[in-house]
């Protein structure tokens, strides 16, 4: 335990950055507005001039912050519908949102200054184990073939409000900023202790996107920080409670002495003691922990996770949040794919001199398929088809122009194909394309009060071209016009598109 605390204090430094006075500066709120305009997911800031930034209202807000009763009204009237207890709903809405967005930028400043304050001759340590989300699937395809067990983890959230504040206390010593953070958290919760309702989380995430991401990333980085510590100590932790711990150490020393005598001896036999070969991947609120070894070792890691959440984050989690499966006999749902590592048989004919014989081998292959039932359920929920997958019209879109209807259906189809292009089987995607294409035709026919057959004959190839995806257009250049849909080999091609930016929307493209 002392080693655990020492490892924690070594990597956490208290920074003397007092950022609370910046809350009285107008340019902080201008930065918040610029982030909303330039961010990948814009944050709307309401104002009196067509949702544009109003410097006059910001100046009024700063003047009100200087007043003594500014925070007293909000604290003494917790049952008010809006923050800051102001008579005019419009001003209250603007002050609430612009203040929270400005504070979100405020709490990020100490972390930025810490990186800038590093000496030039001392390079900032690079975490080679951190990768972009674009490389997750190639990473799984490359590494998971050699692993045995997989733990599917649901990272628990939300946690105690005070724990979130304490996580930042290690790096921010600005007491007024921490008190202001407590104020925001308590305002968006129904009680003063927990954010227990999903409604409170949704409201907080919707109105304070940047602050929510900052707090969530701080919590997850803290969790992964101690997970890295457990990974470094994994050679000892699985054996700490064993009665034969000393005997195993003695056995390890014997093996090291044996290696000195026989340097050509392979060291791979002691991977259980030396290198458990653990790989960790996280996306949104889910994580995957895959490793070699026995089922007993995975059960140990499950206990470590539960104890870490319970004793450090004060979060009581249920064991069902962690599922342990054997890779060879199960599949896992991750980022919109059903992935597995099955053993496929391979028959090899070998001939030696006059004798020939067959060699039956089994090879592992990382297989990813599209969850057809789940995606058809999304289409059914969005009223593109019935629950069984029968295409229907979209009445709510009949007021749009023909071009807008075609564009919307085509964009949804291209997004599905673009994201799920790495699937090893494309039959499900072609079924989804058929549903969307026929649903589009029914919608246009309903708008013009015609039949589907008549409308498709009148529109011709323009209607079909709208549903071509990028990879299919490449194949179209290689075939004649009579074979536009006979892509006999395209279903075996696996293409991982690494230029996806708004990946969250593509995982669930209809919500």
Swiss-Prot record:
One of its GO terms (biological process) is RNA splicing. Disulfide bonds: none annotated. It comes from the Eukaryota. Signal peptide: none annotated. It is found in: Plastid, Chloroplast. GO terms for molecular function: RNA binding. Usually encoded in the trnK tRNA gene intron. Probably assists in splicing its own and other chloroplast group II introns. Belongs to the intron maturase 2 family. MatK subfamily. This is Maturase K. It comes from Bromus inermis.
